[in-house]
């Protein structure tokens, strides 16, 4: 599905990713973990064509897509859901979804079926369909952002910290819904997330980024190794800041 091989990304002269390899198979959920500033969001933006890839290769659905623009990636079936700025606040829930469906070819019945698919996954959005996105709760807004992407029938979702700012009970519900999306829509997911404990309940594979480099890649079932890697990063961060680990 998605193959990233040896990519480098920089902001001007400042390199943020170095020789990164990552793969996401069909209908798989891959968790991308690491501290703030490790390069997780930059990796998603590079894959999606929002940041230039200086070296390496991105392949999606059998085609090389390195440095293709976001509209080209979306047309192939890839969608990025950023952490912020992911809905139109002055539009209703239904109008947000309708905009998401603009890329979906077909008759009105096809669009109606997609609405039903989304509302079936996120029932609260059906109840709130006449409400403006600006009055939604944080959890409802994240559900709407993901649903807008789903309206285009994607093959791959790139989710950038969807649980940020949510209460613990909402985090659990959101992750269960993400797992349901994989089952019901057949999509693959590359999930950037700080809430590692909850994310490990739904991901199949894990990659850990440290200072722009992959330091661990393996099955989510290898929790001991994942915890050791993250503990090492925590300890290194505390020591470098002068705090006691």
What are these model-predicted stretches?
Residues 2-4, 17:
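Conserved structural motif at the start of ABC-family nucleotide-binding domains
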Residues 151-155:
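A short, proline-enriched helix->beta-strand linker immediately N-terminal to the Walker B motif
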Residues 172-185:
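Helical segment within the ABC ATPase nucleotide-binding domain
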Residues 120, 204-245:
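C-terminal boundary and immediately downstream tail of ABC-type ATPase nucleotide-binding domains
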Residues 56-65, 76, 110-115, 216-218:
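Conserved ABC transporter NBD signature motif
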Residues 33-35:
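The feature captures the beta-strand-to-loop junction immediately N-terminal to the Walker
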Residues 48:
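Helix-to-loop junction immediately C-terminal to a conserved catalytic motif
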Residues 132-136:
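Conserved ABC ATPase signature
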